[in-house]
Regions:
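Glycine-rich, basic loop-to-helix element that forms the pyrophosphate-binding segment
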Residues: 61-78
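Short, flexible, basic/aromatic active-site loop/helix in glycosyltransferases
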Residues: 137-158
């Protein structure tokens, strides 16, 4: 059986170059191709100087939003018609060396159970506070949050964040691209909900827990943990 090939998409906007390079280096050995789409960064002249064998850099002239950049990268990459999976990353997450294999295994395991998997995702832990971001399942009446441990079984949330998401090419064909009317927030959530509407499932596996930073950390407000984002994202 031929090895399933993975196309990784990284979207950047004014990234820290050292951290971005670490992110790319953590992914490049695990996938067949990395496409970086920059959304009109002030330091794009530094981004284009990053040289890694299987990396292609696309510099956009302006910031058209994360959905546009992700879709642009996927469209460019799928011209080759050789990839089975798409992997999405932000600009500052460094991934463990086995993240792709573990997420592909999650796909295989669940598909063998007769589940129609759209995407598989890891869990994230904020290393500053040791806060484990929960798996979230929404319905009309309630919101259920589950904190995982490494020994737990896979969970099936209503949505996951795009960074760290491994998506099948078939899911991309069936569900369609990300909604470009949404600039930053809700892009990944809206796509996941469309996947569910197409009778596909979202899988979150505790076999992969990634250390990262989301916004400026967590604050307790009215008894709930709230993520504090930077002013650019808010306004």
């Amino acid at each position: 059986m031929c090895k399933a090939k993975v196309l990784a998409i990284i979207v950047t906007y004014n990234p820290e170059i050292i951290r971005l390079t670490e992110c790319i280096n953590s992914l490049a050995p695990q996938v067949e191709r990395v496409i970086l789409v920059d959304n009109g960064s002030n330091n794009s002249h530094l981004i284009k100087n990053i040289i890694i064998n299987n990396l292609e850099i696309i510099l956009l002239s302006e910031n058209k939003g994360i959905a546009f950049a992700q879709n642009h990268g996927v469209k460019k990459g799928l011209e080759a018609k050789e990839f089975d999976y798409l992997f999405f990353s932000d600009q500052d997450t460094c991934f463990p060396s086995d993240v792709i294999e573990k997420l592909k295994s999650t796909f295989t395991k669940n598909n063998k159970k007769g589940k129609n998997v759209a995407c598989a995702s890891p869990f994230f832990k904020d290393h500053r506070s040791n806060y484990m971001h929960p798996s979230v399942c929404l319905n009309i009446f309630t919101s259920t949050k589950v904190i995982c441990s490494e020994v737990d079984d896979d969970l099936y949330p209503s949505h996951v964040i795009a960074s760290g998401m491994l998506m099948s090419r078939e899911a991309w064909r069936v569900v369609g691209p990300f909604c470009e009317k949404l600039f930053i927030d809700w892009v990944d959530t809206e796509w996941c909900w469309r996947a569910l509407a197409n009778n596909m499932i979202i899988v979150q596996t505790p076999s992969v827990i990634i250390s990262h930073e989301l916004g400026y950390g967590q604050k307790i407000f009215a008894g709930r943990s709230v993520t504090i984002h930077n002013s650019f994202r808010n306004y």
